[in-house]
Amino acid sequence: MRVTGDYSKDDYVKVEGLVAPEICTALCQQLEMDIRASGRTFQSFALAQPLTRQATVEITGHQSRPLLAFLWGLTPIVSELTGADLLPSFDYFRIYPKGDICRVHSDRPSCEHSVSLTLAYSDGLPWNLQIGTQPVEDAKSLNEDFGDEPFSSVAMKPGDAVLYQGVKRRHGRIEPNPNGWSAHLFLQWVERGGAHMGHAFDAELLRAQAEGERA
């Protein structure tokens, strides 16, 4: 594993080899086997959403035990990388189709510390993640690009990741995906005893959803 950058200064670093490529492949295969066993396909999880131009396959850790176990299992190493005592919040797997983008945005409080992990590219072509250089105080609207704000662009291979503070830094993928598809895992943590600790294990969102169902 190789870390490039200064997390305490820039709120992000590139982590090469966070996960072995073989494990990334095995995770994708396990997800597909589990989905098929339930009588569904990846495409049945495709959703239209504001962040993307096209419908994207999205599966959350609440829907998949392997994804949840992956989040919990990475917690010690991400705590070490950030220098903070972390609790897991939530994670999700996403497949972006060819030509898609991820609009520039900042995240909700449950994404205090975030990891964007590349799992697979259908054509082996890196699809960079862009991160703004200016911290944001409040969530901003979705944008196609960063406007006048300078940003960094980080290329990743399968198994590589970017660790960043999703609440404080705007981020996205503003160039169209050059692959037929690409698979990614996004993992989120909050600090134990911190301002966002109430979001550990995604408790705030799950509580709101439960209250909505009872209403």
Tell me what each language-model feature is.
Residues 1-82:
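Non-heme Fe(II)/2-oxoglutarate
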Residues 83-92:
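A short coil-to-beta-strand element that immediately follows conserved catalytic motifs
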